[in-house]
Amino acid sequence: MRGADVMQEELFTIGGLDQYVPVDHPLRRVREVFNDCLARMDNHFEALYSAFGRESIPPEKLLRALMLQVLFGIRSERQLIEQLRYNMLYRWFVGVPLHEQPWDHSTVSKNRERLLEGGTPEVLFEQVLDG
């Protein structure tokens, strides 16, 4: 008997994005090193953000997304967000679970400007060299 060509969504997703990324994938090591650098930048990030108001995109996630943009030659933030919508490898690297929608590209632009004005690229570069 021929099976039907239908796609049934699961009610619950078991496991996380990590299970879809091969153990030997090169981005695993990149993410590990990058996360170590970002962890050492916590005081820098705290100084850039107010304790009040709406939560913004976590700077660590934004920087991981921008790292993907550079590594894979993604030409615009609009394309970056499009990739984050359906690319599980990118979602895993950035830390965006399947049940969350990626941010709007204009929000990414505004938050990127905050990081640039706050000297984040220089601090990140220092952390990479010190790593």
Residues of each region from the PLM?
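Short acidic (Asp/Glu) and glycine-rich catalytic loops that position anionic groups and cofactors
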Residues: Q8-T13, M41-F45, H105-V108
